[in-house]
Regions:
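Cytochrome P450 catalytic-domain helical core, especially the substrate-recognition surface
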Residues: 1-17, 61-137, 141-191, 401
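Cytochrome P450 I-helix active-site segment
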Residues: 1, 240-279, 293, 298-301, ...
Length: 401
């Protein structure tokens, strides 16, 4: 089996490449770029056209689908059926009256956690997982679920790596076996709880028309997507707070005032998601021969959509490669919506976007009320496995307020 460090290095280098190519004016109005043999689109107008044309540009997650199928990696009527299983739960959980409950969950977990990055990460994970389970009327078992969650992340990392680098038969078989094993273990945990078993039955009833439907796969993929993106975003907020002391105190003062509106904090969260998009890129498969921005595409061809590039496009952002806590495009609400897509856009955008945004806002408030952060340096390092999180060992120090 491939060296984990090799897998991590290759995937991180792919994202570093996207950052290196972004934010620079190459003189082209639109058009595509290339990474190796892969065509990359990063102009907001082009990417907007792609994501709003799901019949022409279809989801294709290659070997990642060995972990299972869900609303995130299916198309057409099957996608619509899977979406309907979970969408009402997400919308209900994101209603404004639930904001206080979300705040209380994160505040309680952070109050009890160890004063360390690892402790805060665990508290954020536990809070986000609790909120996700509650959306489906369930109660999570924090520790065993955390272990399974980490296994899902590492399995997805390997599967994604093998989607780019052709594995040997032994490597492929091992990765698929591990994927099936973690899904089976998740299933055993869920089905041991009568409430979870009943909810999985509801999933199956709603998906009666899908051959081979697995409610466990649907649940696990939704869980991973929802929790991982929320936690990684708040981790990046913490990282940037540590690097911006004056900004941190301004945000603390704004939150401590207890006002319903926190425009500077909201701007800072947006700038964090712009600079460090939770999902840095997507891939799509072209369903039929087409031409986009003068680039000829053939049926079956894979293309990349660089969210990093969209978020740093110089036509749409002033000094896009600079992290600006007071970015005027956000303060003035003047940004082009096509150029800011942390939850994606179009008919296949993140179904839990409202809930995710609510969680991030409340988690950041809870973190800032309880902790102060500093950084010994401002070297940015990350760890990519579907979602973009800060690398472990970052030089962030913290203390309780």
């Amino acid at each position: 089996v491939s060296d984990p460090a090799q897998i991590e290095g290759m995937l991180n280098n792919l994202v570093y490449n996207l950052f290196a190519r972004s934010g620079q004016d190459d003189g082209r109005a639109t058009g595509a770029k290339e990474i190796g043999n892969l065509i990359v689109f990063d102009h907001p107008e082009s990417v907007d056209e792609i994501v709003k044309s799901p019949a022409l540009f279809r989801k294709n997650f290659s070997l990642i689908s060995a972990l299972g199928f869900s609303r995130f990696n299916t198309n057409d009527e099957e996608w619509a059926t899977r979406r309907a299983i979970t969408q009402d739960r997400y919308l209900a959980a994101a209603k404004p009256p639930h904001g206080q409950s979300v705040s209380d969950i994160f505040s309680g977990d952070l109050a009890d956690c160890e004063t360390s990055l690892a402790g805060i990460h665990q508290a954020l994970f536990t809070g986000a997982m609790t909120i996700f389970y509650q959306a489906f009327g369930l109660v999570a078992e924090a520790r065993p679920t955390a272990v399974l969650f980490d296994r899902v992340r590492e399995t997805l990392r390997r599967l994604q790596y093998y989607s780019w680098v052709t594995p040997t038969n032994a490597e492929r078989d091992s990765a698929i076996q591990d994927a099936r094993a973690v899904i089976a273990d998740f299933g055993s945990q869920l089905m041991a709880d009568p409430r979870a078993a009943a909810e999985m039955d509801r999933f199956s009833e709603r998906a009666a028309g899908i051959d081979g439907f697995s409610p466990i796969e649907e649940f696990v993929m939704n869980l991973f997507a929802g929790v991982e993106t929320t936690v990684t975003t708040v981790q990046w907020v913490i990282d940037r707070l540590g690097a911006n002391q004056q900004v941190q105190e301004r945000i603390y003062s704004e939150i401590a005032d207890g006002k319903a509106q926190t425009p500077f904090t909201d701007c800072f969260i947006n700038e964090t998601m712009r600079y460090f998009p939770p999902i840095p890129f997507l891939t799509r498969e072209v369903s039929t021969d087409a031409v986009l921005d003068g680039t000829s595409l053939r049926a079956g061809q894979l293309i990349m959509l660089s969210v990093v590039g969209v978020h740093q496009h110089p036509e749409f952002w002033e000094n896009p490669r600079t992290f600006n806590a007071s970015r005027k495009e956000f303060i003035n609400n003047s940004f082009d919506r096509r150029a800011f897509i942390p939850f994606l856009t179009g008919p296949r955008m993140c179904g839990g976007a409202r809930l995710g945004r609510l969680e991030v806002e409340q988690a950041v408030r809870a973190v800032v009320r309880q902790f102060a952060f500093t950084r010994a340096d401002d070297v940015i390092r990350f760890d990519y496995a579907l979602a973009l999180r800060p690398a472990s060992g970052m030089s962030v120090q913290m203390s309780r307020r």
